[in-house]
């Protein structure tokens, strides 16, 4: 029984220009928010595909909230074109995009005994303090992901750089729990 993952969020970064005038962007883009006393970047949200941008004076851009890597590429390309259309001529229209983090969820569809899992997986790779947080934090070395395991059987995978790394994290957890007789 394979569990499928659902990508909840993709965070990616790129460099669209050598520098940006964030005050100009805020005045030209409806809905853009810039308050340098509160945060050094400009926040801009797009609806389709749904995502949010953090745009910095350095020309760097962080995109968050997309549900897949293809949407990240689409919204970053659209953002580059939009910035060019409002007068930023030095925009890189085909930027190199770096996925920084993917958050995914999965469901093993069974209740889990987190105390037994904590003992079985070994204390060097896990954090489990139920008084502090209801999930067990399991750090996997390869791929380098963190899997939050909940007693409901739900999993949250963070730190993946690709959907495949997130899927591999879930596969490893499932395999180890099966090997321990806990699934």
UniProtKB/Swiss-Prot annotation:
GO terms of biological process kind: DNA-templated transcription initiation
GO molecular function terms listed in the Swiss-Prot or TrEMBL record: DNA binding; DNA-binding transcription factor activity
Keyword Transcription tagged: yes
Q: What Pfam families would the database entry show?
A: TBP (PF00352)
Q: Which UniProt keywords apply?
A: DNA-binding, Repeat, Transcription, Transcription regulation
User: Would you say which domain of life the source belongs to?
Assistant: Archaea
Can you say where the sequence repeats lie in this chain? 7-83, 99-177
The record ties this protein, via InterPro entries, to: TBP (IPR000814), TBP_archaea (IPR033711), TBP_CS (IPR030491), TBP_dom_sf (IPR012295)
The UniProt function text for this chain reads:
General factor that plays a role in the activation of archaeal genes transcribed by RNA polymerase. Binds specifically to the TATA box promoter element which lies close to the position of transcription initiation.
The UniProt similarity line reads: Belongs to the TBP family.
Q: Which PANTHER family does this one have?
A: TATA-BOX BINDING PROTEIN
Record protein name field: TATA-box-binding protein
| Record lineage | Archaea, Methanobacteriati, Methanobacteriota, Stenosarchaea group, Methanomicrobia
